[in-house]
Amino acid sequence: ISGYGQNGPYRLKAGHDLNYLAYTGVLHSTGSIDTPIAPLPQISDYAGALQATTAILAALLRAKLSRSGAYLDISLADTVLSWQSHALTSMTRSGYSFSRGNGNESGGCADYHIYQTADAKFVSLAAQESMFWENFCSAVGHQEWISRQRESVPQVSLINEVTRLFASQPLSHWCDLLDSIDCCFEPVLETTDIISHPQVIARHLLSKNDWPDPLVQVLRPSWIDDSAPKPRLAPKYCGVSAVKTAWDAKSS
């Protein structure tokens, strides 16, 4: 696994996640019109690990079937570039934009946008399908917005109207109003809110351990045979002297 792969003019170039996102155009479509943002978590680090896992599994299958090994060249930048397939294959489509703050899914549409509430909190609205948009507009008492969903992008006027609506009430008001409405609405949670979220609890995604140095474990995000992921056991604690003694004994 490397940043830019084992060949090409960048093969010896150093980099980190932000560099790979810049090189692949991700930062061009992420953030506000004024400036890109540095996303967190680091996209290429996790994407590259997943790509490596997929490639390793494929190589293991090939080894089992053909008794032939494989040399795997995984590039973090390549992996992020592959995640840009939608943007890259849509570049020639008339009227489709991925530019920062102006694209269909990068801030240019009112039905797929982040809005601020009266108490300086934020909500996400992703009512891209007409049924979700209609449900949202009806719930907030603005049926006149329904027919405007497909206005040309960027939808500056419509976005401003929806922005004023959300800014008129605190987050609790919008959660009470829209949580039960099928309109793809979700408040932007703070990290401390995630631990107690009922969906996270139901999915057994986190675990508070009883290690000497307690922390919250993020568990495997998959259920297998209807079984929830299980917490990992605490590593065995060993003092430095004990480790050195064991190491010396093994080396002798």
Regions found by a protein language model. Give the residues of each.
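Active-site-adjacent "lid/gating" segments in soluble enzymes
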Residues: 1-123, 127
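Residue-level signal for nonpolar/aromatic packing positions in well-ordered secondary structure
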Residues: 17, 56, 67, 136, ...
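A structural signal for well-ordered alpha-helical segments within the folded catalytic domains
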Residues: 47-54, 131-134, 172, 241
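Short coil/turn segments at secondary-structure boundaries
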Residues: 103, 175-180, 210-211, 236
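Aromatic-enriched alpha-helical interface/lid elements that frame and gate functional surfaces
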Residues: 111-181, 185, 247
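Short linear loop/turn motifs
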Residues: 147-163, 188-198, 212-216, 252
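Flexible, small-/acidic-enriched active-site or ligand-binding loops
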Residues: 152, 207-252
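A glycine-rich dinucleotide-binding beta-alpha-beta segment and adjacent secondary-structure elements
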Residues: 180-227
